[in-house]
């Protein structure tokens, strides 16, 4: 029976079927032209936003989604191609929130904005090492 549990956990881990983070966004936000707006993305409580990068996408009517930016920290972020610096990311790790700020709002900023999260590669490697350690420990206990 122990082998079955280990095998199922391993399959779930390798296929990405383990507990996945859920994000929630408010359905609507509005502001005036020229102003600054901050959109939020809440990560489910069973995950810590501190170990995730937040990805933001914009979809204008009649256009495919386009990548705006990735934000992990002030020193670890990436702006999408041709995305002006008036689009910026941030996090509130205490409240488990990610933010997209858009300053100097323009008419073309009217769009649907999506957030997504992904493990930072260094954190993913650390978790894989921990998993290997747990797997070895489980093997020793059998």
From Swiss-Prot:
Only expressed by pre-B-cells. It comes from the Eukaryota. One of its GO terms (cellular component) is endoplasmic reticulum. Residues 20-41 are annotated as: Framework-1. Residues 82-115 are annotated as: Framework-3. This is Immunoglobulin iota chain. One of its GO terms (biological process) is immune response. Disulfide bonds join 41-115. InterPro entries: Ig-like_dom (IPR007110), Ig-like_dom_sf (IPR036179), Ig-like_fold (IPR013783), Ig_sub (IPR003599), Ig_V-set (IPR013106), IgV_Light_Chain (IPR050150). GO terms for molecular function: signaling receptor activity. Belongs to the immunoglobulin superfamily. Associates with the Ig-mu chain to form a molecular complex that is expressed on the surface of pre-B-cells. This complex presumably regulates Ig gene rearrangements in the early steps of B-cell differentiation. Residues 71-81 are annotated as: Complementarity-determining-2. Residues 1-19 form the signal peptide. Keywords: Disulfide bond, Endoplasmic reticulum, Immunoglobulin domain, Signal. Interacts with IGLL1. Interacts with SYNV1/HRD1 (via N-terminus); this interaction leads to increased VPREB1A ubiquitination and degradation in pre-B cells, possibly through a lysosomal, not proteasomal, pathway. It holds the Pfam family V-set. Residues 57-70 are annotated as: Framework-2. SUPFAM superfamilies: Immunoglobulin (SSF48726). Residues 42-56 are annotated as: Complementarity-determining-1. The keyword Disulfide bond applies.
């Amino acid at each position: 029976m122990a082998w079955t549990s280990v095998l199922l956990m391993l399959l779930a881990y390798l296929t990405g079927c383990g507990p996945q983070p859920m994000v929630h966004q408010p359905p609507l936000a509005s502001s005036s032209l020229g102003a600054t707006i901050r959109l939020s993305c809440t990560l489910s409580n069973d995950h810590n936003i501190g170990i995730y990068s937040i990805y933001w996408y914009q979809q204008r009517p009649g256009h495919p989604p386009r990548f705006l930016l990735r934000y992990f920290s002030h020193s670890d972020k990436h702006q999408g191609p041709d995305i002006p610096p008036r689009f910026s990311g941030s996090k509130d790790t205490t409240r488990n929130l990610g933010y997209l700020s858009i300053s100097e709002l323009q008419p073309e900023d009217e769009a649907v904005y999506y957030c997504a999260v992904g493990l930072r590669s260094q954190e993913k490697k650390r978790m894989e090492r921990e998993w290997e350690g747990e797997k070895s420990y489980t093997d020793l206990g059998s």
